[in-house]
Amino acid sequence: MEKKHTRGSFTGSIGFVLAAAGSAVGLGNIWRFPYLAAKDGGGTFILVYIVLALTFGFTLLTTDIAIGRKTGQSPLVAYGKIHPGWNGLGLLASIVPVVILPYYCSIGGWVLKYLSVFLTGHGTAAAEDGYFTGYITGTWQPIVWLGIYLFLTAFVVYRGVNKGIENYSKILMPILLILIIGISIFSLTLTYTDADGVVRTGLQGMKIYLVPNFKGITPQKFFTVFVDALGQLFFSISVAMGIMVAYGSYVKKETNLMKSINQIEIFDTIVALLAGLMIVPAVFTFMGTEGMSAGPGLMFVSLPKVFQSMGAAGGVIGTIFFLMVSFAAITSSVSVMESIVSCMIDKFHISRKKSTVIVTVYACLVGIIVCLGYNALYFELKLPNGATAQILDVMDFISNNLLMPLVALLSCILIGWVVKPQVIIDEVTLGGYKFGRKRLYIVMVKFIAPVLLAALLLQSFGILNV
């Protein structure tokens, strides 16, 4: 007789909301959102982002979570249960976290390394030119920190939905919010006089960040802002990678799904806005507008220099910052690993503990290759969008720029045109709950979201340039 492995479920809506928000709040909120906001006219970008979050983001999030709860299955199985002919979409969605996990954990290792540097009082060393490059091009250190980070991620997943994911989300997410609010307030109090006698303050930086700047905005410029906001939102809310389908499958039928989805949206957007409020004023104060950059350059090069400029307080603020980033990264990587583990439990009937061990070994082996991509296995490859890439960048491009928009596009076609939106509406309104923005959802999933996702795909291939 085949042994049945229990899947587990969230005990209530709070655990689900915090776990899902933890997944959505990741490195992208912290190292990409502030840069784009500063680049794209501050409040102009934020305004476009919020409108898209309430329409486009809401549609994709609702679709993923409702599919998960309706089927009670992981992505590998769920899409086939919605329609027998769409098993392939489940396979495609399940490949995304398999690609993401190893390189995300490699970056997570970088974060832990910097946390340890600031914890041990060596933050000034991290601010030196070439420190970050010297670290990632090293042979053993990145691999060791990858292993530590992967162990922490696997530990949470190994403990299961209730004792692991839900419990740790309830602890980490409130702490993350408190830390990010604290650093944001501190950033606004900063003042600095540069070598030319120019005084810059955190409040001036906040103005650059929040006040819409329509000066010189053309239709083409607005389109750039729109596509930037669209891409950032899409990658921020953890859709189209099987995560929200997996988390949705753990939600009890009596839970008010629409209320939970609204709370996830709000939490993710607030953290993204606070990340900007934390970073833009601080970077502006000490480095001016030209100090803003995106990605690893912002977090591992610019910000350590900012912390150094703060004097004695910099070491403490740097430690708190990298602790907060560690929490944000781990809650995200836990959800990525859980998406893969849930597929193994549902499809292959392997126990959670065995599945977690198998996935951890896989992520470690591929993660080592990613780490070596900056030294022994270094190469440069030109991507379709014009960027130059190494192993990590190639994996990021495949998952974020190709697979995720494709999975989301096919999901919209499946729900909007094949099985019809009523399937999702029935699941959301189960138990007599209201579906707010129902008409908006139907229009978005059938018409607008597919067009926007097609535009993202075209941009990834370098066909649509902004």
Give short role names for the model-derived ranges.
Residues 2-6, 10, 170-330, 354-355, ...:
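Membrane-embedded translocation segments of transport machinery
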Residues 12-50, 243, 259-262, 266-269:
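Transmembrane helix-boundary motif of multi-pass solute transporters/channels
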Residues 36, 40, 66, 81-82, ...:
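Membrane-water interface regions at transmembrane-helix termini and the short interhelical loops
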Residues 4-7, 36-40, 73-92, 105-164, ...:
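Inter-helical loop and helix-membrane interface segments of multi-pass membrane transporters/permeases
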Residues 1-31, 60-65, 69-81, 87-88, ...:
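Membrane-interface "cap" regions at the ends of multi-pass membrane proteins
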Residues 89-92, 138, 348-360, 396-453:
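C-terminal membrane-solvent junction of multi-pass transporters and transport-like membrane proteins
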Residues 9-20, 46-48, 85-98, 144-149, ...:
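Select transmembrane alpha-helical segments in multipass membrane proteins
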Residues 1-3, 108-137, 248-254, 259, ...:
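Helix-loop-helix connectors at the membrane interface of multi-pass transporters/channels
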